[in-house]
From Swiss-Prot:
Zn(2+) 1 binds at H79, D142, D199. Pfam families: M20_dimer, Peptidase_M20. It is found in: Cytoplasm. It comes from Listeria innocua serovar 6a (strain ATCC BAA-680 / CLIP 11262). Keywords: Aminopeptidase, Cytoplasm, Hydrolase, Metal-binding, Metalloprotease, Protease, Zinc. The gene is pepT. GO terms for cellular component: cytosol. Its cofactor is Zn(2+). Transmembrane segments: none annotated. This is Peptidase T. One of its GO terms (molecular function) is tripeptide aminopeptidase activity. It catalyses: Release of the N-terminal residue from a tripeptide.
């Protein structure tokens, strides 16, 4: 299993599938369709049935039931794209066997070092096989580790018919990193009662709570006048944007919050005297607090518009996804089954809220309750991203055990 995981993973990460928020097509980048087509070929090769890919890059396939029991159809999902934070082009994975717990020099020329001083969790991986970047790109374990684990688990089940399971559906989706993954996902065609995204982090992670999420696009319209004659005439749009940001509680930012704490996050601010634009994301687990945060943003915009005049501040506020806990708690047994599967494999489940979003958050609201299971990676979205091969083995075993337990309980 280890060899197959390593071979598939290092192949998949070399395909540049970084998504692009500026694109209006789906998938937003051609590399995602390239990987989708590779996976279609490989799914057929291992013996999966009903293998399809649509024009938008959504891959679906079926592993038929091998039991006489009536077992609910379950699904496993992972996303094709990698994050926009750092390039995913020319990924050159480095394999470090029997990690010694010390610094790993990712790139000598650029002095990029993966160090336990900066990342103390590396101590957990002593003696393991780590797959890292070469210090110039992200790795793409988010979520090509998940893709790999699903592929290997399906191959294992096909080759071990003594493990009884119901019908299993798998899907690989585009553009998750920019929040568009579920937009064109056909829940009815997928046909599962429950599903799981293999999109979590370290060993044992199990998540069924996500943020409520919104985005706020602000445009500040100023009045540019020659600075020599600007008195009582100039309105500096950049300063308006700064004034707006000064009204946001400084301690309610990502760098000061964790656990169940929500935040406002200024993603970008650019412009000049005439016009400036800023973009915030708003996050909270509690729905009432989420509404309060959006109201606060709107009230600041209104206050500045009153001060600087009609048309001076434009706000576009849009909800992005909601806390999936509301949709999963009524069917909490799907979380309990994963916990049991992990314990059967000597993994301690680490149930915590996702300080982010997954496709599962939106899919849960489309009628497909979808918790999130660990994929094994650490330090996603950057050059220090890595994954332990042993964690990928465990994630693969969890998929197999979940399928077995669903059949066993019927």
């Amino acid at each position: 299993m280890k060899e197959e995981l390593l071979k598939r993973f290092t192949k998949y990460v070399k395909v540049d599938t970084q998504s692009n928020e500026e694109s209006t097509v789906c998938p937003t980048t051609p590399g995602q369709m390239e990987l989708a087509n590779i996976l279609v070929t490989e799914l057929k090769e291992i013996g999966m049935q009903e293998v399809t890919v649509d024009e938008f890059g959504y891959v679906m396939a079926t592993l038929p039931s091998n039991t006489t029991k009536e077992v609910p159809v379950i699904g496993f999902l992972a996303h094709l794209d990698t994050a926009t934070d750092l390039t995913g082009k020319n990924v050159n994975p480095q394999v470090h066997e029997n990690y010694d717990g010390k610094d790993i020099v990712l790139n000598k020329d650029l002095n990029v070092v993966l160090s336990p001083k900066q990342f103390p969790e590396l101590a957990n991986y002593k003696g393991k096989t780590l797959i890292t970047t070469d210090g110039t790109t992200l790795l793409g374990a988010d979520d090509k580790a998940g893709i790999t684990e699903i592929m290997v688990a399906m191959n294992y089940l096909i080759n071990h018919p003594e493990i009884k399971h119901g019908k299993i559906r798998v899907a690989f989706t585009p553009d998750e990193e920019i929040g568009r993954g579920p937009e064109r996902f056909d829940v009815e065609a997928f046909g599962a009662k429950y599903a799981y995204t293999m999109d979590g982090g370290p060993l044992g992670e199990l998540e069924y709570e996500s943020f409520n999420a919104a985005g706020a696009k602000l445009t500040f319209n100023g009045n540019s006048v020659h600075p020599g004659t600007a008195k009582n005439k100039m309105i500096n749009a950049v300063k308006m944007a700064m004034e707006f940001d000064a009204e946001i509680p400084k301690e309610e930012a990502p760098e000061y919050t964790d656990g169940y704490e929500g935040f406002y996050h200024l993603i970008s601010l650019n412009g000049d005297v005439e016009q400036a634009k800023s973009y915030y994301i708003i996050r909270d687990f509690d729905h009432l607090k989420f509404v309060e945060r959006k109201t606060h943003i709107a009230s600041i915009a209104e206050k500045l518009a009153e001060k600087y005049g009609e048309g001076s501040v434009e706000l576009k506020l849009n909800d992005q996804y909601y806390n999936m806990r509301e949709k999963i708690e009524p069917v909490k047994e799907i979380v309990d089954i994963v916990s049991a599967a992990m314990r059967n494999l000597d993994i301690e489940p680490k149930i915590s809220p996702i300080r982010g979003g997954t496709d599962g958050a939106q899919l849960s609201y489309k009628g497909l309750p979808t918790p999130n299971i660990f994929g094994g990676g650490e330090n996603f979205h950057g050059k220090f991203e890595y994954v332990a091969l042993e964690s990928m083995v465990k994630a693969t075993e969890v998929i197999i055990e979940v399928a077995r337990l669903f059949e066993e309980k019927e």
